[in-house]
């Protein structure tokens, strides 16, 4: 009875963690120890932080244009060509050195400005979601292009936030002659958890002192320590058999699809005997060509998620054994390849506490009636509580007991967090109570809600960079936590081998299909103030 009560308590705690995170918009944010905001710095530091925030306020139009432009590109993972060309163009014009094609990934890049220590990295994701096309500002399902991808995770907003912050900080660094280096980078193919482990292998973070990440949410928030959620391995299993006429001589065939189905059946029976924390799911990516041909080739794609390295590795081993068993039962051959991976996240206490002080100073944007009307409109459409938009920032949380983590989503920022002191800023560019990875999550992402949320987030990010540049004790404390607490007992072990390569072919066919029509609707800021205006959308449109 005691064990059952403990498990139920852990489940309820995990549910609360997810609810709090969704409400605050932070990545992590699970209950645990309440953090302590970093005390204000010396007067000159605080003066410069106020100055950088005021400067970002004057950059609102440029920020809005970046957010809208990337939204209109709507590119899937590994296919973010227009997005990367556009963003690197802005940075290059502002004096950043650009290294393109980083880690052998055509859409990956690093933009660097400055010299010396500390080296502060600013990262955020840029890819979007299949079949999530949606007109912004419209509070019901209304695709821009039916079936096309769209920013149903809000990844059009994070790098514009970082660019805004970096340009404002750069101005102060030049004037004040502050030593230090700014390093901007994009999260390519995050929805495939497909790139960041290759960045690490290629050395992107070897000289970085602190990494500040940004991810869209519905509130301003940050947490430290082990958050809720999981890491994962993304594995494709391909079975090879022998074709035959499915009616005339089926006994001469060896069905690769049978092997896929046997593996899926086996895994579904195995679920009952796996830990509650695990999440596993699959899609059949090749199931044959037509019913009258015994499929000679078939593939299934699995995500194996767990809360720590050892259990993720164990799930992969179970999957491999099950695939081998399925091949034996069907007299087929099986091979596998890794398409992506992510470590569970662990965020830095010092960096998070520093960031939270700036969150308190900036606070949430001032939402107007139109913003709240759109938010309540889509919440009503989805039959969710009509709470509107966030009006109060959450608490700084951290130090979650691993036993309280009952699983959840994954993000390959986890790999980065185990290689350099990292904190993730959740910023209020979206609407609470949305399902995630859905057309509904694209509704706000080229509207004043996103524009205001990104500006608020850029202020927090820039102020945190100023703190790190001018208060070397914070960088040292962040390093101490990373070395003496986070990685004292657990070291980073990559899920990829030296021979594994990024899955660059993923999403090619989808973008080839929809890209030409999407290109006709790219945002043109020389003709229209906003993307809403270009699309002829009255803000807000609800029913």
What are these regions (language model features)?
Residues 28-29, 258-261, 265, 269-273, ...:
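His/Asp/Glu-rich mid-to-C-terminal helical/loop segments that flank catalytic regions of hydrolases
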Residues 1-11:
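Bacterial N-terminal signal peptides that target proteins for export
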Residues 141-150, 156-157, 173-295, 305, ...:
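Histidine/acidic-residue-rich, glycine-tolerant segments that coordinate divalent metal ions
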Residues 250-286, 291-293, 306-337, 345-387, ...:
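Acidic-enriched catalytic cores of C-N bond-cleaving enzymes acting on peptides and small amides
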Residues 24-31, 35-151, 160-180:
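Acidic/His- and Gly-rich active-site-bordering loop/insert found
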Residues 70, 91, 111, 122, ...:
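Divalent metal-coordination and catalytic microenvironments
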Residues 9-19:
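Bacterial N-terminal signal peptides
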Residues 376-458, 476-543:
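Zn-dependent metallopeptidase/amidohydrolase metal-coordination segment
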